[in-house]
């Protein structure tokens, strides 16, 4: 894991927010800010490769530039990149960097939580074993998440402000390509950078 922005103080509780961030949206920031009510620091992680998708449109360097702008100097936000992509891999990397005394959570939306719980890990660590390393913080996006009883005590739901639950990166890209309004879906610094690199959003 390579840090690009590092918060100053060692957190007792850390939330890891992995994503493709294509582009970062107001929903990403709202998730992180809501998580700060229960953790000390949020670590945004942009993988250099993804387990279930490939890079298209804006590349790694541009997305990292957008993330730097989106975080806006919040002293409780950190930013890192990783050659890994699975939640358990990122959590173990964070454990190496933050130490055994830091309580780890992975922050995600309901759709991602449902995927990780049901994913076939091919004989590797199942979700119960992974949740021995980290908890899940699940933002109530696109409906409430009701986790299976065996892992319910390792999953915490966090609320999002009204109006951001349905915002997604794919919606931003679709609106840009369709010539529809999109600026209110992303932080203002991100919108300015997108305007400067519009060719990546019109093609990807």
How should these model regions be labeled?
Residues 1-204:
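Nucleotidyltransferase catalytic core that binds NTPs
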């Amino acid at each position: 894991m390579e840090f690009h922005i590092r918060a100053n103080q060692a957190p007792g509780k850390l939330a890891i927010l992995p994503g493709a961030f294509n582009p970062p949206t107001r929903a990403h920031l709202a998730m992180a800010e809501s998580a700060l009510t229960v953790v000390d620091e949020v670590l945004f992680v942009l993988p250099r490769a993804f387990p279930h998708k490939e890079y298209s449109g804006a590349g790694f360097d541009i997305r990292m530039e957008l993330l730097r702008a989106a975080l806006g100097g919040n002293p409780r936000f950190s930013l890192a990149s990783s050659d890994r992509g699975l939640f358990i891999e990122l959590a173990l990397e964070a454990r190496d960097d933050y130490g055994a005394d830091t309580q780890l959570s992975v922050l995600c939306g309901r759709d991602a939580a449902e995927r990780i719980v049901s994913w076939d890990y091919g004989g590797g660590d199942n979700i119960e074993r992974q949740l021995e390393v980290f908890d899940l913080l699940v933002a109530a996006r696109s409906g409430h998440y009701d986790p299976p009883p065996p892992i319910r005590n390792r999953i915490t739901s966090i609320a999002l402000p009204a109006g951001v639950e349905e915002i997604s990166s794919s919606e931003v890209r679709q609106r840009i390509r369709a010539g529809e309004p999109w600026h209110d879906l992303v932080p203002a610094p991100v919108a300015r950078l997108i305007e400067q690199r519009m060719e990546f959003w019109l093609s990807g």
